[in-house]
Amino acid sequence: MSHTPVLAERILVADDDRTTRFAISSMLKKAGYAVTAAKDGAEALRNIQKKSFDLVFLDIWMPKLTGLEVLARVRAGESRPKIIIMTADGTPETLLRAIREQAYEYLSKPFPPKEAVEVAARALKQDASPRIEVISAQPHWVELLIPCTREAAERIHSFLMKLEADLPDDLRNTIGLAFKELLLNAVEWGGKLDPNRKVRIAQVRSSRMLLYRVADPGPGFSFKGLTHAAVGQPADEPIAHTNVRDQLGIRPGGFGITMIRAIADELLYNEAQNEVIFIKYLTASAGVSGTAEVPS
């Protein structure tokens, strides 16, 4: 994705590794941004307090102040630029603290410097959205209230998928597709893309299963009335919903519920069908490192 700033947006790059700091700063400068560099957390915080930045790339493990300490102090202050956390530390505790402190995105090192330009373009084109509320931030139980925007849904999907890094790639990607579709359905249809409304989501992990619960603020729905989805079509017209989606001007698709049903081991809706529980059982070979056992 290309992004040419009309006015040079200001970006701070903070990393104690000189090579990384130089590579990212250089790529961002070539893309037309006004870049300031900092070699440790204390210098990064001083820069943020003195100047107005649109975006900050922040390494976690830096001398004097860690990136997470800087993030917490920034959130308590008046200047609150969007912050991209970048680190090789992929532990659940670090990731969850980044979510709690309202990090905008989380980049896992190593990554190609050009990815910083793509992330910057994506972050800077988005308006500021309401806070993501953290209800629980334990590795085995994450529960959040997120604003009903596609941007928030995409961010949280990216964060939570990183929590499942111990799963095989194909399994994690498959589960991720289902969770993303549930989340987008919730913000689009239940929340009507109203950023002042919230979707409540929970991710629960034990050694034997991965569970997602998604509750949207809408009145619910009936499968019989889903003219815009493949699941609501007669057998002789399985893709009639595509015409409906064109007429309504909504994103291509409509196969989401059908796909989710195929992926889930259990899919449970409440009576109004504005809450859903997705369950995937994990085999011993799927990997369980870093998880917490749910007490029996």
Where does each model-flagged region fall?
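Receiver (REC) domain active-site loop signature in two-component systems and cognate sites
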Residues: 62
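Alpha4 helix (beta4-alpha4-beta5 surface) of REC/receiver domains from two-component response regulators
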Residues: 69, 90-105
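Acidic catalytic/metal-coordinating carboxylates
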Residues: 39-43, 66-69
